[in-house]
């Protein structure tokens, strides 16, 4: 029951209205050697960071529920998201579909992603699933692992519908 509730909450969060806030185009210049990686990081910061947001404490890199995060928190968490999913474009797609992912604790995101990889047939399938519904990265890893057999199919159908009906796509 708890696993189904986690999945439903993740889906509901994805349909929450988008809040448009004043955002600076790029709050800092990235020094990554790969220009594509630097562009992805700058895009994530421009999309997710809020100028003037309080800096997160070192042990608590996450967004509050209002969705505000400083540029350094977004940058650090986004780089760790790239390492988790293994692809800068996929990571950018994830934060584009749910900006809050850029502020969630990276170890929690990794544990949840790994749980979805374990439940899906392939890593690519899990990546496609969480790219379409990034709220699934907020599910407790234990709930993902212990969910009933049909829950992955349900999650895929919901993610597909969310992707189909995504506003501004």
Identify the role of each PLM range.
Residues 1-22:
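N-terminal chloroplast transit peptides
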Residues 27-169:
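Long amphipathic alpha-helical repeat/alpha-solenoid cores
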């Amino acid at each position: 029951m708890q696993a189904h509730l986690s999945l439903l909450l993740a889906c509901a969060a994805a349909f929450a209205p988008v809040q448009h806030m004043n955002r600076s185009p790029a709050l800092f210049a990235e020094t990554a050697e790969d220009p594509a990686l630097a562009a992805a990081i700058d895009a994530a910061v421009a999309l997710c960071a809020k100028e003037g947001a309080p800096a997160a404490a070192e042990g608590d890199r996450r967004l509050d529920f209002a969705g505000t995060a400083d540029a350094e928190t977004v940058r650090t968490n986004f780089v760790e998201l790239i390492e988790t999913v293994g692809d800068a474009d996929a990571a950018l797609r994830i934060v584009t579909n749910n900006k809050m992912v850029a502020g969630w604790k990276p170890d929690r995101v990794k544990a949840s992603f790994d749980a979805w990889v374990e439940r899906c047939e392939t890593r690519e399938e899990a990546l496609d699933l969480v790219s379409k519904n990034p709220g699934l990265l907020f599910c407790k890893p234990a709930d993902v692992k212990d969910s009933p057999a049909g829950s992955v199919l349900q999650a895929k159908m919901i993610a597909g519908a969310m992707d189909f009906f995504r506003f501004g796509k």
